[in-house]
């Protein structure tokens, strides 16, 4: 009974890790080594985050933004 609980717990944690790290079953089965992609986030759409960095912000802009968000 103890072994079954340990195996069940390990299986649940293993599934939670594999699905939370955005690895898909097809990729999980076809990649070599089979456990090499656990824990890695999906980096396919990293270029879509380029809009987060705006080099036109100055220190004055950031100070105004900080003052505006001070009460939150």
Curated annotation (Swiss-Prot):
- Cleavable signal peptide: 1-23
Write out the tissue specificity statement of the associated record: Expressed by the venom gland.
Q: Which UniProt keywords apply?
A: Amidation, Antimicrobial, Antiviral protein, Secreted, Signal
Chief site of localization: secreted
Q: Which GO terms describe its biological process?
A: regulation of defense response to virus
Highest taxon of the lineage: Eukaryota
Report residue numbers covered by any propeptide.
42-72
Where Isoleucine amide occurs, residue numbers? Answer: 38
Q: Where in the cell is it found?
A: Secreted
Q: Quote a single Gene Ontology cellular component term.
A: extracellular region
What the protein does comes down to:
Antimicrobial peptide.
Q: Extra info from the record? A: Shows a low ability to inhibit hepatitis C virus (HCV) infection in Huh7.5.1 cells.
- Give the family, as the similarity comment puts it: Belongs to the non-disulfide-bridged peptide (NDBP) superfamily. Short antimicrobial peptide (group 4) family.
Which protein is depicted?
A: Peptide Ctri9194
Q: Which organism is it from?
A: Chaerilus tricostatus (Scorpion)
């Amino acid at each position: 009974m103890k072994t079954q609980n340990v195996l069940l717990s390990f299986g649940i944690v293993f599934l939670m890790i594999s699905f939370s790290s955005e690895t898909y079953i097809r990729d999980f089965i076809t990649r070599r080594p089979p456990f090499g992609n656990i824990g890695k986030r999906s980096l396919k759409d990293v270029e879509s985050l380029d809009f987060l960095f705006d080099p036109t912000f100055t220190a004055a802009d950031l100070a105004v933004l900080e003052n505006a968000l001070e009460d939150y």
